[in-house]
């Protein structure tokens, strides 16, 4: 409810969540002991999934050194790089980004291909992307165009974000 409707309900009372609201989660791909797996419907509610590799040696050195002297969270002296108001402003700016009907059809073609059992790779896909993937591609392509300094979406914007939007929504078959 929080992720989809930006509200929570306790008993008969509903509370709107403050803006900006977003959920970030981490996943350890190796250790699954004591971990509760999320069902596909909940995983689908995450807009994107970004996979990070190991840090560069110099970054890992800094992490190592800072953690040796770490006493409490405040010791890191983290500072906000953007205000909540700026996040809301940027989110609203994406609404003004133009997305042509041809790009919308391109997005629908990408998503629907994951559902075609008779396609070249159909036997390897147990469950294709839901309509939430189309919505996520639509939103993220606009955000990518904005980040690239454009007020319109091009196919490259969709290609740039497609893997992060779709990777957690495609369930592979045993084949």
Question: For each predicted feature, which ranges?
Answer:
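Canonical AAA+ ATPase core
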Residues: 3-97, 142-144
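C-terminal engagement/docking regions of AAA+ P-loop ATPases
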Residues: 115-175
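A short, terminal or domain-edge coil/loop segment
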Residues: 67-70, 110, 175
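Short alpha-helical scaffolding segments that buttress acidic/His motifs in well-ordered protein cores
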Residues: 63-64, 107, 111, 161-166
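Short alpha-helical basic/polar micro-motif
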Residues: 44, 105, 138-139
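Short amphipathic alpha-helical patches
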Residues: 22-26, 31, 69-73, 87, ...
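Conserved AAA+ ATPase small/helical "lid" subdomain
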Residues: 75-134
């Amino acid at each position: 409810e929080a992720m989809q409707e930006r509200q929570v309900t306790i008993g008969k009372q509903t509370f709107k969540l403050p803006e900006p609201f977003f959920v970030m989660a981490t996943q350890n791909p190796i250790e699954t002991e004591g971990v509760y797996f999320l069902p596909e419907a909940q995983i689908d509610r995450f807009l994107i999934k970004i996979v990070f590799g190991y840090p560069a040696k110099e970054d890992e050195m800094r992490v190592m050194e800072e953690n040796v002297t770490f006493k409490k969270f405040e010791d890191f002296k983290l500072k906000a790089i953007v205000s909540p108001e700026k996040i809301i402003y940027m989110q609203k700016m994406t609404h003004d980004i133009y997305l042509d009907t041809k790009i919308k059809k391109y997005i629908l073609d990408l998503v629907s291909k994951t559902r075609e059992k008779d396609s070249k790779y159909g036997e390897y896909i147990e469950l294709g992307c839901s309509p939430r993937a189309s919505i996520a591609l639509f939103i993220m392509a606009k955000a990518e165009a904005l980040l690239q300094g454009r007020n319109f979406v091009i196919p490259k914007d969709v290609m740039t974000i497609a893997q992060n939007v779709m990777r957690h929504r495609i369930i592979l078959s045993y084949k």
